[in-house]
C-alpha cells in the first residue's frame, strides 16, 4: 500500500524529523531531510512500513 505523497510530506515535520514540512517532491514516497525538506524515496511495500514507523532522518 502506498501513501498519498502530500499527506506524508506534510506529516514529516511532526514526526521525529523536524523542519521537513515543506518542499515536498511529487512522489508516492517521501523521506525526511532536516535541511532541505522532503525528498523522493523509492522503497518496497515492506520498506514503506519500516520507513513510516521509524521516520529516519538522512
Curated annotation (Swiss-Prot):
Keywords: Keratin, Repeat
Top-rank taxon, per record: Eukaryota
Gene Ontology annotations for the cellular component aspect, listed alphabetically: cytosol; intermediate filament
Keyword Repeat: yes
Subunit architecture: Interacts with hair keratins.
Biological role stated in the UniProt entry: In the hair cortex, hair keratin intermediate filaments are embedded in an interfilamentous matrix, consisting of hair keratin-associated proteins (KRTAP), which are essential for the formation of a rigid and resistant hair shaft through their extensive disulfide bond cross-linking with abundant cysteine residues of hair keratins. The matrix proteins include the high-sulfur and high-glycine-tyrosine keratins.
Name of the protein in its database record: Keratin-associated protein 21-3
Gene source species: Homo sapiens
Lineage of producing organism: Eukaryota, Metazoa, Chordata, Craniata, Vertebrata
Amino acid at each position: 500500500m502506498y501513501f498519498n505523497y502530500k499527506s506524508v510530506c506534510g506529516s514529516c515535520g511532526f514526526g521525529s524529523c523536524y523542519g521537513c514540512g515543506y518542499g515536498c517532491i511529487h512522489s508516492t514516497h517521501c523521506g525526511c531531510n532536516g535541511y532541505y525538506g522532503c525528498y523522493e524515496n523509492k522503497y518496497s511495500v515492506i520498506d514503506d512500513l519500516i520507513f513510516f514507523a521509524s521516520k529516519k532522518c538522512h
